[in-house]
Amino acid sequence: MNDKHLPDASAENPWLPLRQLTPARIALGRTGTSLPTRPQLDFQYAHAQARDAVHLPFDHAAISDGLRQRGRDSLLLHSAAADRHVYLQRPDLGRRLDEASVQRLREHAAGYDGQIDLAIVVADGLSALAVQRHTLPFLERLEEQALAEGWSLSPVVLVEQGRVAVADEIGELLRAKMSVILIGERPGLSSPDSLGLYFTWAPRVGLTDAYRNCISNVRLEGLSYGMAAHRLLYLMREACRRQLSGVNLKDEAEVQALEGEAPRTGNFLLARD
C-alpha cells in the first residue's frame, strides 16, 4: 500500500497566527479527522468553568470590605428568589426584592437627604465570578470620574440572586434619577467572567428591556474598566439632557485610547507591533 497520498496524522491550521488576537476557538488543528487532545481537554475545562460560574456563591462580604476600605458604604439585599435553584427556575422572582429588603431600603431612603443622581446596584446574576473579579476595579474608575463631574452616587446596593430588573425597584425606592446594575452575564465557553452594565433613566418597576442601555463584556480580555466607565458616563450625560434611556438613546461615545490602554484600530485582524 502506498501511503504517499495520505494526509498527515496531525496538522496545524494555517489560521494559527490569528489565535494571538482572540480567545475564540479557531485554528485548533487536527489529528486525523478529529481535534487534537489538547483542544478537546480545553473545551471540557471551559465548559466546567462556565457551569461553576453559574453556581458559585456570591462573596458579597469581600466586595463590601473592599468598598469599606475606600470609604464607600454598601447595603446588602436579597431578591424574592430564595435560593439558586429558585433563581434559575423563576426569573421573575429575581427581578423583585423580598419584603425584608424592601422594608430595609425604604428605611434607608427615608434617612437620606438630597437627590441621588445614580443608584449603583451589584447583583450576582449568572456569574458571581464576574462580579467578584471586576466590580471593585470598575467602580474605582467609575467613581473617580463621576465624582469629578459632580454626580451624586448612592451607597452600593448588593443583591443576592438578582436579575437585571431588580435595579428598577431599587432606583425607584431610592428616588434616584438613574440606575446602573453591575451583573454577571451568562458564561460563555471563553468568557466565564464577563460583567454586564445595564443603565436606566427614571427607574421604576415595570420597565422593559427597551428602556435600558447595555454595556457588555466588561473584563480584562474584553471592554476595559476605563472604557466601560467612559461609555456609562456618556449615557448618564445624554440621559439627563434628553430625559430618556434605552432604544432611543444610542451610545455614540467617542472611542479613544485611555491612559494605559492600547489604541483601537477598529479591526482585530490587524496586528499591532
Swiss-Prot record:
Provenance organism:
Pseudomonas aeruginosa (strain UCBPP-PA14)
Q: Does the keyword Lyase apply?
A: yes
Per UniProt, subunit arrangement is: The basic unit is a heterodimer which dimerizes to form tetramers. The heterotetramers trimerize; 6 large subunits form a core ring with 6 small subunits projecting outwards.
Catalyses which reaction? Answer: ethanolamine = acetaldehyde + NH4(+)
Family, according to the entry, reads as follows: Belongs to the EutC family.
How the cofactor is bound: the record states: Binds between the large and small subunits.
- NCBIfam families (alphabetical): PRK05465.1 (NF003971)
Q: Which residues bind adenosylcob(III)alamin?
A: 164, 185, 214
Q: Which GO terms describe its cellular component?
A: ethanolamine ammonia-lyase complex; ethanolamine degradation polyhedral organelle
Q: Which cofactor does it need?
A: adenosylcob(III)alamin
The EC designation for this entry is 4.3.1.7
Q: What is this protein called?
A: Ethanolamine ammonia-lyase small subunit
Main subcellular location of this protein, as a coarse class:
other
Q: What keywords appear on the UniProt entry?
A: Bacterial microcompartment, Cobalamin, Cobalt, Lyase
Q: Which PANTHER family match?
A: ETHANOLAMINE AMMONIA-LYASE LIGHT CHAIN, ETHANOLAMINE AMMONIA-LYASE SMALL SUBUNIT
InterPro entries from the entry?
Answer: EutC, EutC_C, EutC_N
Its annotated compartments are: Bacterial microcompartment
Query: GO molecular function terms here?
Result: cobalamin binding; ethanolamine ammonia-lyase activity
Record function comment: Catalyzes the deamination of various vicinal amino-alcohols to oxo compounds. Allows this organism to utilize ethanolamine as the sole source of nitrogen and carbon in the presence of external vitamin B12.
- Respond yes or no to whether keyword Lyase is given for this record: yes
GO process terms (BP) = amino acid metabolic process; ethanolamine catabolic process
